[in-house]
Amino acid sequence: MHFHERFDVIVVGGGHAGTEAALAAARMGSKTLLLTHNIDTLGQMSCNPAIGGIGKGHLVKEIDALGGAMAIATDYAGIQFRTLNSSKGPAVRATRAQADRALYRQKIQNILQNQPNLRIFQQAVDDLIVENHQVVGVVTQMGLAFESPAVVLTTGTFLSGKIHIGLENYSGGRAGDPPAIALANRLRELPIRVGRLKTGTPPRIDANTIDFSQMAEQKGDSPLPVMSFMGDVSHHPKQISCWITHTNEKTHEIIRGGLDRSPMYSGVIEGIGPRYCPSIEDKIHRFADKSSHQIFIEPEGLNTNEIYPNGISTSLPFDVQLNLVRSIKGMENAEIMRPGYAIEYDYFDPRDLKNSLETKAINGLFFAGQINGTTGYEEAGAQGLLAGMNASLQVQGKEAWCPRRDEAYLGVLVDDLSTLGTKEPYRMFTSRAEYRLLLREDNADIRLTAKGRELGLVDDARWAAFSEKLESIELELQRLRGQWVHPNSPLIHALNPHLNTPISREASFEELLRRPEMDYSKLMQIEGFGPGLEDPQAAEQVQIQVKYSGYIQRQQEEINKAVRNENTGLPLTLDYKEVPGLSNEVIAKLNNHKPETIGQASRISGITPAAISILLVHLKKRGLLRKSA
């Protein structure tokens, strides 16, 4: 049975990747269908109730700069906001928000339901329709076929998902949801490498049974940050505290005593877990010399008693979970509302993807999110936006687009995945980016919004606000460069008390701002130098561009050198055995990875600069040198 309409783009799955993919394709004018097994869980925060953090917050800002929904929803759902690394340089500062699960889900669903060109339909997908290596549609659980030349799969942990609590296990996509078994079996028939990964979640605790007086209170920042470039503090709901406690030796003894019934340590779980978000069992095993581990006590919302104890993700049996929770200070009488568990699921080797996130094997089939081996809402949302956008571009007959590594963390993420692959759940850190001084949270819109507008992702309201901000920054920079003060002027007499070394020569306002002891707000408060910019985002941009101009210029020069051959394209049909001079190891690796560009090839382990030179000579001789989009 065929559905009565055709669609330009079909998105399968309604998590963080799926919602951003569907919204992106629809914003670009494509007739889009979002298929989900349950409309009520669209935008669900399946694990921790938080958005952002180091590296992750950068991705959220990039999603926002390209017109995505995650940052906006966070501003409406965030019940605590903090700027991490606030005492460090701007490159590594990151915004993190504790979110009310219900408010976040409601806001995402509201955005989806009001998006033109987007249809939502509740049905699980069991099959793909593929003809001559081209996807042409999907088939749902009830046998209903939907036709489309572009399909984005955002299946999360649902592909052959198996939930483990102790030595007991059962099939599930996440707690309370069925797995996608038929679709997983269908995907295993495709010529794409498949593996198993695992992730986990902690038990949820009843707040009424916690003694918060024994814990350290952690308040949010003041003044309050916002997540979206279009956000405002007035969008935030009521702000509340989180709390901090610690495990202890008794906790660790309880965990060690239960390891014989741990699915991880008894060989029941085959999948590899996230290195940077390990289970409490893993922490005790890997860091045996540590006598305690920090636990963040995070409220799940304003109208629920559920608490998320961040730091004790576990798949131990329930009796062990209860004992370990009650061994922790402040939780001696705690009651568990939901047990912690681990979940194993299928993922597909992202080296089998183009950097558009389209599969190399099947035209029109795109993957985004945990299906590609990543972990985290932010990583999923960023991939979803890129996949939905490129699916729409393909339907429109336009070239795919992906930012370079020096343009966005999204570019770093996709390049790492498609070039290097991953054997464990991949999460983003600022340390993964070579050019992080240019890839700051604060300038994500300056880096990406113009491109987003060109692609059709950015609406008129965002574009107008961005254009106004850019103009105000440029005018203020011109003012600071163009206004000068003499050492004997009244302005200097007012300024000198604020300086470590008095001004002894004529100086521009820009030079004064560049001094280490001076910042923009302080300078603007001194009579004769203000009033300055009212928009805090624009003011921050002015300060960073002035103070870091030398470093930024040097990093830009490094990038210009590096990208000379970065985008030189490599034919996917090229058999590297035909390239004379390459070693057998290099031939095997290049034929295995099938990199799209010289830049990707150069980042494959074992590919030497000499091999790259040989490749370039071969391409030139054969007339195959071309620049990738």
From Swiss-Prot:
Disulfide bonds: none annotated. Keywords: Cytoplasm, FAD, Flavoprotein, NAD, tRNA processing. One of its GO terms (molecular function) is flavin adenine dinucleotide binding. GO terms for biological process: tRNA methylation; tRNA wobble uridine modification. NCBIfam families: mnmG_gidA (TIGR00136). Belongs to the MnmG family. This is tRNA uridine 5-carboxymethylaminomethyl modification enzyme MnmG. It comes from Shewanella baltica (strain OS223).
